[in-house]
């Protein structure tokens, strides 16, 4: 069996590494990654949930001492200025697990040299490759006719380099602003991603670039490095003919809140791995589309409580409707359970061991309480 991954961005690298690692002892499986070295990976420093560092540790010998990707600790996400009840809300990850921030250029080099798959430098059409299974990870599409929009109030970002040491924080920062919110990714000054580790996210149909730049510079000590516009979207057909699978930005793009992308890439390749090697799933497309729509909904929920700013953006952001009975059911559950019982059963809690997209009940409980109950710190 031959499996080919096309593209070596975040999605392509994690796809090839997962497949190469989990099939390494199967002599009947060959994994190959083909990419154009002239096509640069994402420039912005990345943040993850816990699966990415777990895979990198297992398959590349990455660790916090031997750290060639300038990774920094991510113990959770600190929300500043969100809602009307608390100045700060901390979305804590389980204390026995650690997510990360990393430089995508250096991660690409680490993965391509892992030895778990063959690497070929070339420009190819995935649909013309002779292989049993193909993963199309060529990045954002030029034509969106086979895609649908994801609901989100953000469509632009100004990237910047910080003039302070961001690595003192062991968490991502999500700071509410009059025009949206700003991410601050703890990044070493020697990392290639340091120039792009602060991002002011906004809606270009509401705020002008000039006003946004002024607000950005007034709120943060940064040097602006790049302007980015984007769409939030998902492929209508993530799996084509049970042979070609879209992943990475070829599959979807959703604004960076909650760092959902890399976890989703790994979840999707895991679904497909199980489909190929263990049991056939006739509903692959429906499954991943539902998963990504859940990511969309959880992110939208963060805007519904507003922020300390009463502006046009925040009025607009609160208008998005979440149309999912499962979402409403879980929200009702977390309103009637203590934060301790919301812990997973494995940790001594009594909550159901479920996930909505990527989030267990304790994540839901953290946000619900932070938006509705004054936290004593």
Predicted regions: what is each one?
Residues 1-11:
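Beta1/beta-strand and adjacent pyrophosphate-binding region of the FAD-binding site
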Residues 17, 21-25, 113, 186, ...:
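Short, well-ordered alpha-helices that flank and scaffold nucleotide-derived cofactor binding pockets
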Residues 20-44:
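Glycine-rich FAD pyrophosphate-binding loop
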Residues 38-89:
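N-terminal FAD cofactor-binding segment of flavoenzymes
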Residues 47, 92-113, 137, 204-207:
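Short beta-strand to alpha-helix junction loop
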Residues 114-216, 220:
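Predominantly flavin-linked oxidoreductase catalytic cores and closely associated redox partners
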Residues 188, 202-305:
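FAD/FMN-dependent oxidoreductases across multiple families
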Residues 278-377:
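Long, low-complexity C-terminal extensions of enzymes
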């Amino acid at each position: 069996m031959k499996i080919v991954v096309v593209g070596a961005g975040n999605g392509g690298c994690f796809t090839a590494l997962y497949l190469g690692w989990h099939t390494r002892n199967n002599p009947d499986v060959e994994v190959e990654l083909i990419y154009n070295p002239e096509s640069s990976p994402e420039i912005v420093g990345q943040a993850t949930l816990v699966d990415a560092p777990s895979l990198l540790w297992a398959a590349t010998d990455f660790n916090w001492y031997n750290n060639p990707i300038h990774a920094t600790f991510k113990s959770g996400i600190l929300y500043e200025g969100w809602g009307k009840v608390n100045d700060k809300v901390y979305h804590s990850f389980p204390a026995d697990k650690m997510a990360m921030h990393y430089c995508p250029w250096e991660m690409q080099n680490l993965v391509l040299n892992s030895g778990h798959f063959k690497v070929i430098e070339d420009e190819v059409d995935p649909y013309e490759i002779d292989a049993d299974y193909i993963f199309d990870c060529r990045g954002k599409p030029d034509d969106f006719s086979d895609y649908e929009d994801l609901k989100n109030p953000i469509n632009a970002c100004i990237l910047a380099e910080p003039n302070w040491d961001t690595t003192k924080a062991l968490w991502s920062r999500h700071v509410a602003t009059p025009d949206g919110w700003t991410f601050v990714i703890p990044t070493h000054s020697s990392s290639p991603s340091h120039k792009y580790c602060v991002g002011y996210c906004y809606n270009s149909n509401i705020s002008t670039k000039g006003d946004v730049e002024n607000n950005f510079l007034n709120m943060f000590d940064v040097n602006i490095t790049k302007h980015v516009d984007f769409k939030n979207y998902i492929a209508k057909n993530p799996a084509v003919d049970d042979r070609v699978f879209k992943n990475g930005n070829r599959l979807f793009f959703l604004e960076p809140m909650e760092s959902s992308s890399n976890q989703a890439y790994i979840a999707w390749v895991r679904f497909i791995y199980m489909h190929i090697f263990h049991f056939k799933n006739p509903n692959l497309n429906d499954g991943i589309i539902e998963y990504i729509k859940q990511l969309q909904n959880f992110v939208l929920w963060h805007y519904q409580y507003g922020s300390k700013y009463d502006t046009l953006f925040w009025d607009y952001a609160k208008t998005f409707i979440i149309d999912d009975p499962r979402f409403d059911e879980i929200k009702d559950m977390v309103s009637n359970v203590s934060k301790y019982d919301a812990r997973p059963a494995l940790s001594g809690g009594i909550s159901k061991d479920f996930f909505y997209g990527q989030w267990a009940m304790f994540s839901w409980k953290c946000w619900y309480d932070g938006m509705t109950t004054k936290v004593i710190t």
